[in-house]
């Protein structure tokens, strides 16, 4: 992970990782200013923006993450195993299930916890239909992933699911 100023200067490495650590879906933890990210499929972590100190929020299979505005809760989907949408307390790591998405979460890449290598793409090319390319097969078609988000007032969440065979947007109330 790196950060850089808007004008392109001041590039600095915040955290360097190898292919054995799958660091993904970095975003700001609401208004806290800290950075939250997943070490998929092992943990949800937060980095202090100023000191770079890293704390594990939860040893859990969080995948696509969406913090609330205050940075107190993190909405996430899950994969391998798919346990539906979860809300994780950023302070305690406690979680509660919102719903099951029944998304197919396609993509051979997600069956292991390291980045795709050239040989993965070469192998994927051997089994493609005329509608697919290696990126879809190795990394997984994005339209099959839930990618949850909060409503403006944070009383509902939206997510995608291809449970019917066609990707559609669903809304789940949190009340």
Residue locations for each model-derived region?
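Sequence signature of WD/YWTD-type beta-propeller architectures
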Residues: 1-175
């Amino acid at each position: 992970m790196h950060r850089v100023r808007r004008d392109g200067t001041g590039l600095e490495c915040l955290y360097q990782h190898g292919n054995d650590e799958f660091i993904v879906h970095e975003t700001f933890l609401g208004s806290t200013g800290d950075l939250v990210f997943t070490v998929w499929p092992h943990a949800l972590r937060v980095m202090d923006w100023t000191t770079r100190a890293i704390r594990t929020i939860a040893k859990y299979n969080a995948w696509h993450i969406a913090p609330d505005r205050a940075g107190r809760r993190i909405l996430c989907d899950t994969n391998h195993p798919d346990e539906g949408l979860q809300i994780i307390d950023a302070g305690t790591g406690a979680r509660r299930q919102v719903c099951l998405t029944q998304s197919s979460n396609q993509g051979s890449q997600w069956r292991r916890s390291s980045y795709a290598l050239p040989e993965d793409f070469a192998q994927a090319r051997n089994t493609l239909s005329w509608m697919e390319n290696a990126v879809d097969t190795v990394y997984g078609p994005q339209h099959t992933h839930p990618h949850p988000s909060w409503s403006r007032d944070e009383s509902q969440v939206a997510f995608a699911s291809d449970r019917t065979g066609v990707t559609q947007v669903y809304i789940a109330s949190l009340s």
